[in-house]
């Protein structure tokens, strides 16, 4: 008979400790980093949740967690590129209410062949690069901290170091 571990019993389905059953790791408790980056992969916002949470449920919290000041949408349009997992009317509405122009491909639409006619081709690799930069920090690769505040603090420290390195590289 299957018994739940004490970690999963805390909070409403793992919200208190930002962990949840990981569907890809035999149901062990795990956490997920939701990451918002700019066009170069530099992190703008990070939110933690349980590994079993869908990304679209944390979109509003992620957009509210942006640490840089957004320019006025009337002067400079802000585009938000998301993948097919965010193809819900609530996600489009959340992005539009915060002044973003959402670019979300339809779930049932075929993937277009890459051509030169794209003005701004979709680039999912930008977020993946951001995640790989976080994974270079050994403290973040495996979550040892039990409290989500401490783990989020280490993630934010890593984001500061990533931004600092990007600024150093850009200024020379």
Predicted regions and their residues:
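Polybasic low-complexity intrinsically disordered regions
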Residues: 1-107, 119, 158
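Flexible domain-boundary/linker segments
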Residues: 57-58, 76, 112, 147, ...
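Short Gly/Pro-enriched loop/turn and capping motifs at secondary-structure junctions
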Residues: 85-88, 108-111, 132, 139
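Basic, amphipathic alpha-helical segments enriched in Lys/Arg and hydrophobic/aromatic residues
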Residues: 94, 98, 118-172
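Short, charged, surface-exposed secondary-structure boundary motifs
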Residues: 111-117
């Amino acid at each position: 008979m299957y018994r739940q571990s004490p970690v999963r019993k805390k909070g409403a389905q793992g919200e208190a400790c930002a962990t949840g059953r990981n569907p890809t790791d035999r149901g062990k408790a795990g956490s997920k980093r939701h990451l918002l980056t700019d066009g170069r992969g530099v992190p703008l916002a990070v939110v933690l949740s349980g590994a079993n949470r869908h990304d679209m449920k944390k979109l509003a919290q992620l957009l509210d967690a942006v640490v840089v000041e957004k320019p006025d949408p009337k002067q400079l349009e802000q585009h938000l590129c998301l993948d097919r997992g965010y193809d819900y009317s609530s996600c489009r509405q959340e992005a539009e209410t915060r002044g973003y122009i959402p670019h979300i491909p339809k779930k049932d639409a075929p993937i277009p062949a890459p051509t030169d006619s794209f003005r701004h081709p979709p680039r999912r690799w930008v977020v993946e690069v951001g995640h790989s930069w976080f994974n270079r920090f050994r403290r973040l690769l495996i979550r040892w901290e039990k409290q989500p505040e401490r783990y989020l603090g280490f993630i934010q420290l890593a984001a500061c170091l990533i931004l600092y390195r990007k600024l150093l590289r850009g200024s020379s």
